[in-house]
């Protein structure tokens, strides 16, 4: 994305640990696209959860347009032992009422759609099925 002129960052545990100022840059809305896992965002010990999520004056929160959830089939109850933070997506939705939420998966079943809709507190789900090759 950087080659296309889109300021982006991937918040993975290694990057966050190596560059502690990264969160400040995210909070100051220096990036147009921020990639992060539910664990990075929703663990009670994370900077985002403690400092940014509940601060509507945060430039990042104020400018947030879309939250895209990859692997959105994971909230299926049989898979939550693997990634328990996916069960907390509804908290994220409740704190970011103006953001659009989008879920993506290559293996989504009707049960997974129902689970993701419930887990992420989506009150007006628009489901688009498209196979891209």
Predicted regions and their residues:
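SF2 helicase catalytic motif II
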Residues: 31-32, 36-100
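Generic alpha-helical secondary structure signal
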Residues: 20-21, 47, 87, 111-114
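Short beta-strand/turn micro-motifs composed of small residues
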Residues: 12, 69, 105
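Conserved nucleotide-binding/hydrolysis micro-motifs of P-loop NTPases
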Residues: 15-17, 39-42, 73-74, 106-111, ...
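Conserved nucleic-acid-binding Ia/Ib motif block in the N-terminal RecA-like helicase ATPase lobe
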Residues: 1-43, 128
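Short, glycine/charged-enriched secondary-structure capping and boundary segments
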Residues: 1-3, 25-26, 48-51, 80-85, ...
């Amino acid at each position: 994305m950087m080659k296309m002129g889109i300021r982006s960052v991937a918040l993975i545990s290694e990057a966050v640990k190596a560059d502690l100022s990264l969160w400040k840059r995210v909070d100051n809305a220096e990036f147009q696209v921020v990639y992060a896992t539910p664990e990075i965002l929703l663990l009670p010990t994370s900077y985002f959860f403690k400092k940014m999520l509940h601060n509507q004056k945060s430039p990042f929160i104020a400018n947030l347009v879309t939250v895209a959830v990859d692997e959105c089939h994971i909230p299926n109850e049989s898979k939550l032992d693997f990634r328990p933070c996916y069960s907390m997506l509804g908290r994220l939705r409740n704190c970011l009422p103006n953001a659009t939420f989008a879920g993506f998966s290559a293996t989504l079943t009707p049960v997974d759609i129902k689970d993701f809709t419930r887990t992420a507190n989506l009150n007006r789900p628009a489901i688009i099925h498209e196979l891209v090759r």
